[in-house]
Amino acid sequence: MRKCKIGIVGFGTVGSGIYNILSSAVDTHPILKEIEIVKIAVKDLGKKRDIQLDNNLLIDDPFKLINDPSIDVIVEVMGGVDLAKDIILQSLKLGKSVVTANKAVIARYGEEIYKTASKEGVYILSEAAVCGGIPIIEPLKRSLKSNSIKKMVGIINGTTNFILSKMQMKKLIIRRL
């Protein structure tokens, strides 16, 4: 079986965390042996990094990364909106599935992004951008397939989850928080 080759766009806290997990936890789950990070797009090639990695993985042009025909999946964790949208859409149009944790780009351009993914027959996986990474999107899509949900609205994020958890665990009232 051929390995799934991944390109990461962005190497801040989230990008470097993904790199650490995927490169150091290979023995923890068999699927990780089938994944290979082949390129990482960064803003500054000369930046000193606290993480051990092969500098040959680094590239400073995200469009060169997404246009690399050897890369199967793009992980967009660069933040921002317009450039991230362009990278996501171009990746999808190139037939590459995309994983993103970018709340802002999904909130602003989600409809266009999802339509493009559907048209191109690839995936856009954005669950990490919703509810602090709580796995809610896929279960809702699978469990409620026969229903016609048009829209979901709410304020659920990591901070809200933290506050609600503290309230539940310690029976705190909002004034004390």
Language-model features: locations:
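Hydrophobic Val/Ile/Leu positions in short beta-strands of Rossmann-like dinucleotide-binding domains
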Residues: I6-I8, E76
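Glycine-rich Rossmann-fold phosphate-binding loop(s) that bind the pyrophosphate
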Residues: F11
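N-terminal Rossmann-fold NAD(P) dinucleotide-binding loop
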Residues: G15-S16
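NAD(P)-binding Rossmann-fold cofactor-contacting core
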Residues: S24-I51
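A short helix->loop->beta-strand "cap" motif at the edges of active sites that frequently abuts
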Residues: N56, L94-S97, E120-V122
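Rossmann-fold NAD(P) dinucleotide-binding segment
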Residues: D60-A101
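Rossmann-fold NAD(P)-binding glycine/threonine-rich loop
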Residues: K85-Q90, K103-K141
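Conserved anion/nucleotide-ligand pocket segment
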Residues: R142-L177
